[in-house]
């Protein structure tokens, strides 16, 4: 279950970053050298594994940018910034809320396949139930401050630390 959640999260992230890499640099609208517009899907679904019920998401503001950098050891670092806001709805009961998930954040993909995420500002956090219990965090939340997560190549979260606050436990707020 934990691996599935991490793999889904990594898949979404890599899909988003892959889409950004194919976007024209001209769309960066003056962000500077190397920044590309980060196109997010208009809608998305948060699977029931995280909260026990499905959540439908809609991107309300999509004005994010990504920059890819290759480091000396062959790792790839992706810097992400901008403004992103979403609406989240539990279709079973109609509860809806909006969230600012603008970040910024940094993702480092190492040559061995492991990944480190460093987020600051406002961001989504998705954790499978076992990982949520292990780290004492909600399965799906918005937090503010620095959150660092290390993930092994097999999808196992090897460490997670937060120097910040959970702003909204989205599972509780939408249940």
Give the residues covered by each predicted segment.
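Bacterial N-terminal signal peptides
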Residues: 8-20
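Single, functionally critical "micro-switch" positions that shape active/binding sites
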Residues: 2, 23, 93
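Bacterial N-terminal signal peptides that target proteins for export
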Residues: 1-9
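Beta-strand-enriched cores of mature, soluble protein domains
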Residues: 29-175
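Generic detector of short alpha-helix boundary/capping microenvironments
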Residues: 3, 16-17, 82
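C-terminal region of N-terminal signal peptides and the immediate post-cleavage residues
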Residues: 17-35
